[in-house]
Amino acid sequence: MTYATAQLDRMLSCLVIPCRVVAVDLAAAMVRVSDGSGWTSAWVRWHAQAAGKARHWRAPSLDEQGALISPSGEPAQGTFVPGLYGNAGAQPDNREHVEVWRFDDGGSLIYDWKAKSYTITLPSGTVAVKVAGSEVVVTDNAITAKAAAITLTGPVTINGKLSVTGDILGGARIIDTAGNTPNHKH
């Protein structure tokens, strides 16, 4: 084989390299990958779902499988594309109408567009939703809603003690379970 043919063969074989993550540099957003034969790459970037005006962050896991895509067959110039199912993790679902993220701690994000359902599951911790000055925080044992005004429309049932630190204003009657109102006279 001539030198030119050998170089061409090497470059072609390095265009796409199946590999797994062996090191992660979070600050630099780079990984080192290995093809399992003893070869380990230099530090290379990993592919993100979005990196423009909308940006996405998910660092590849150690041993996560993927492919190193190398322009002109030069692995040092490559980009690691994570996310091939294999020994490091099986697929989290198998339905075409569901998008799922599952995490090692038992948490998950599941959107089922057929059912029009989005489920966020955490084994413990906090979920916070913020819009400007309004905020809803859900923790293991409490739900806190903070806003300039909160409107509930429809029947409301409260099972348990109700504590109020401010005034109660009603546009209609307040009736207890016996049918009495606060201004009931005998």
Q: Which positions does each model-derived feature cover?
A:
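Exposed beta-strand/loop interface patches that mediate assembly or binding
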Residues: 1-117
